[in-house]
Amino acid sequence: MWRMRSDTRLLRFAPLWGLCVALLSLSGCAPLPTGGVPDALAPTAQARYEWLNRITWGANTSTARVVEQQGSARWLQQQLQPQGASLPESAQATVSAMTISQTGLTDLVHTMEKQRKDADALRDDIAKKAAQQAYQQELNRLAREAATRHVLRALYSPAQVQEQMTWFWLNHFNVHLSKHNLRAMLGDYEDSALRPHALGRFRDLLGAVSYHPAMLRYLDNDQNAAGRINENFARELMELHTLGVDGGYTQKDVQELARVLTGLGVNMNSGNPNLRKELNR
């Protein structure tokens, strides 16, 4: 059985992942390798802890010791270029056993769609209701897996800056889990669209997010077509994702971008968004 880790990371997660953390029984993290010479970026132990609290999910003794021995500049440089950061064995075993870690997005969505259609096709009302509830419960379970995996990585991965930035971008490019089957997509959305680009170029990150089925479905671009323009994705792309409110664009700009994006929808048969020429304007 894992024991709860007693450091400030858990306190910082409380308002964000309270439900998920309550479900977990977590083990301590092994100390990181040490070595090197300290520098002047964090001259005192108190300053070092405050600095770590700002750029990690909470300062702890082992990380502070590494920063002291390596030096803040060297440690931060390593954080900005993480090389295959690994979790403690027990945490990694939990992550590896998850459905979202073992099943690709396309197969997972196909499985869930089949379950939904099979439930809807039942003629007996009682059986149909039970099957539909089972479908919703499975979607909830997949969403809990994604949340649990995120928390385990954030608490125990040595790549703390990457974890902070993954969380930041997950909030910036958020999707709503109550919509359609997005709960089945959340794990892949984080792993394939956000996490690989969390420390990279914003343009690459924006592209990965804009082409992911979770975002396209959440903001209705799978319904955006010639003759029935849906401006939702175009507006959010400008207002929330890039330029911001009062960012210098006009309603006409939103309309034109929406036309550019017509036909960019979701094709789970190939696992990638698909531009349908008959819908493009």
Where would I find each of the regions flagged by the language model?
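Non-catalytic regulatory/linker segments of enzymes
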Residues: 40-43, 160
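N-terminal accessory alpha/beta regions
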Residues: 61-172, 176-187, 193-195
